[in-house]
Curated annotation (Swiss-Prot):
Sample GO molecular function, one term: phosphoglycerate mutase activity
Biological or metabolic pathway of the protein: Carbohydrate degradation; glycolysis; pyruvate from D-glyceraldehyde 3-phosphate: step 3/5
Protein name: Phosphoglycerate mutase
GO BP annotation list: canonical glycolysis; gluconeogenesis
E.C. number: 5.4.2.11
Site keyed Transition state stabilizer: positions: 163
Family listed: Belongs to the phosphoglycerate mutase family. BPG-dependent PGAM subfamily.
Catalytic residue list: 15 (tele-phosphohistidine intermediate), 93 (proton donor/acceptor)
Modified residues (Phosphothreonine): 37
Catalytic reaction annotation: (2R)-2-phosphoglycerate = (2R)-3-phosphoglycerate
Subunit structure: Monomer.
Residues annotated for substrate binding in this entry: 14-21, 27-28, 66, 93-96, 104, 120-121, 164-165
Entry keyword Phosphoprotein: yes
Length: 211
């Protein structure tokens, strides 16, 4: 749990699989529900946190139902179904612009596999009318620092249930990674990551809760 060197706790979790993940669609700010698998993933993540004794003082999630439902399921599993939960579009997934709602294979046919891969896995190149990961970070990080960090520094145990790219932005900041490093980081659906932070909210260690 917490130690003298790392008194503060932050848990990040990507939402469970959504119906659109299952269909291989670009989702972005579209709002599909969790799939049956996604509900099970969120429940399992919550069970694993409970088995390790984790509790929270406040939770944050996005304005999208797949993250909100994941957050709710986790809190139910750890025995805190009524915990204060703050929802903000600042934690939304990267906005995929013209790619949203398209099957990834269809997008590759339209623009070419290499171009689609550049949009997906470069730090500062955005798809048409969408956000790059850099743009996403510029939305997520000011909110994290102004709104979430004060709770961490008060010693509150914080849960954030969000999305692959909004969480990549946070992880890049927490771990001091470069843009090139963070675009290679894969985040499994529904698997919590526990960050142990020092008194100033800086990264000390982490634990992947995947078993």
């Amino acid at each position: 749990m917490t130690t003298e060197a790392a008194p503060n706790l932050l848990v990040l979790t990507r939402h469970g699989e959504s119906e659109w993940n299952k269909l291989n669609l670009f989702t972005g700010w579209k709002d599909p529900a969790l799939s049956e698998t996604g509900i099970k993933e969120a429940k399992l993540g919550g069970e694993r946190l409970k088995s390790r004794g984790y509790k929270f003082d406040i939770a944050f999630t996005s304005a999208l139902q797949r993250a909100q439902k994941t957050c709710q399921i986790i809190l139910e599993e750890v025995g805190e179904p009524n915990l204060e939960t703050i929802k903000s579009e600042k934690l939304n997934e990267r906005y995929y612009g013209d790619l949203q709602g398209l099957n990834k294979d269809d997008a590759r046919k339209k623009w070419g596999a290499e171009q689609v891969q550049i949009w997906r896995r470069s730090y500062d190149i955005a798809p048409p009318n969408g956000e790059s990961l850099k743009d996403t970070a510029e939305r997520v990080l000011p909110y994290y620092k102004s709104t979430i960090v004060p709770h961490i520094l008060k010693g509150e145990k914080v849960l954030i249930a969000a999305h692959g790219n909004s969480l990549r932005a946070l992880i890049m900041d927490l771990e001091g990674l470069t843009g090139d490093q963070i675009v290679k980081r894969e985040l499994a659906t529904g698997v919590p990551i526990v960050y142990h932070l020092d008194k100033d909210g800086k990264y000390v260690s982490k634990e992947l809760i995947d078993n």
